[in-house]
Amino acid sequence: MQEFTGVWVRDPRIQKEDFWHAFMDYEVCIHTNSLAFTKKSSCVRRRFSEFVWLRKKLQENALLITHIPKLPPKNPFFSLNNAKEIGARMEGLRKFLEAVVHSAVLLSDSCLHLFLQSQLSLKKIEACAEGRTRYTVSEAIHSFSSGHKRFDSLCEENMEEEQCVQCESE
């Protein structure tokens, strides 16, 4: 059987932080039969700044071994209401992830797997990848994966203390 990994970036949503500040996040889904992934299907929500963080992490971890694909350009005048701009950004993010998941060197990065298959915050992804949590990468993916909204810090701390068997935030 031939190995495949499909990546989708879809369902853009405006998230309001407060009256003056809002951002767009996207549903990032993968479907694969690759043994490199813990789960065969998953969906998480990520925002553009998190993709920027991921690219930087991949660059740091891969050093000069491989070329890191480019992200779509950051537009300071990006409109949350312009369907054409949003569509172009989603396509650019999809192409970035497609290139990343088809690179053997980048596919070995724990941050990538946690980014794609868990709803952990960037801070928690970093801590888990560096072995500074009580849970492994695989455990994090199973516990903090699709079907769950982002866990608040209290729930994440409970899991670290092995008290959070099935935390679902509403």
Swiss-Prot record:
Domain of life: Eukaryota
Domain notes: The PX domain mediates interaction with membranes enriched in phosphatidylinositol 3-phosphate.
Sorted UniProt keywords: Cytoplasm, Endosome, Lipid-binding, Membrane, Protein transport, Transport
Domain PX per the UniProt entry, residue ranges: 4-122
CDD domains assigned: PX_SNX10
Protein encoded by which gene: snx10b
BP term (GO), one: vesicle organization
Record-listed a 1,2-diacyl-sn-glycero-3-phospho-(1D-myo-inositol-3-phosphate) binding positions: 47, 74, 89
Upper classification of the organism: Eukaryota, Metazoa, Chordata, Craniata, Vertebrata
Name of a matching Pfam family: PX
Topology of this chain in the membrane: Peripheral membrane protein
Compartments (UniProt record): Cytoplasm; Endosome membrane
Gene Ontology terms for molecular function: phosphatidylinositol phosphate binding
The keyword ATP-binding belongs to this UniProt entry's keyword annotation: no
Record-level GO cellular component terms: endosome; endosome membrane
Chief localisation class: cytoplasm
Family, similarity comment: Belongs to the sorting nexin family.
Protein name stated in the entry: Sorting nexin-10B
Role this protein plays: Probable phosphoinositide-binding protein involved in protein sorting and membrane trafficking in endosomes.
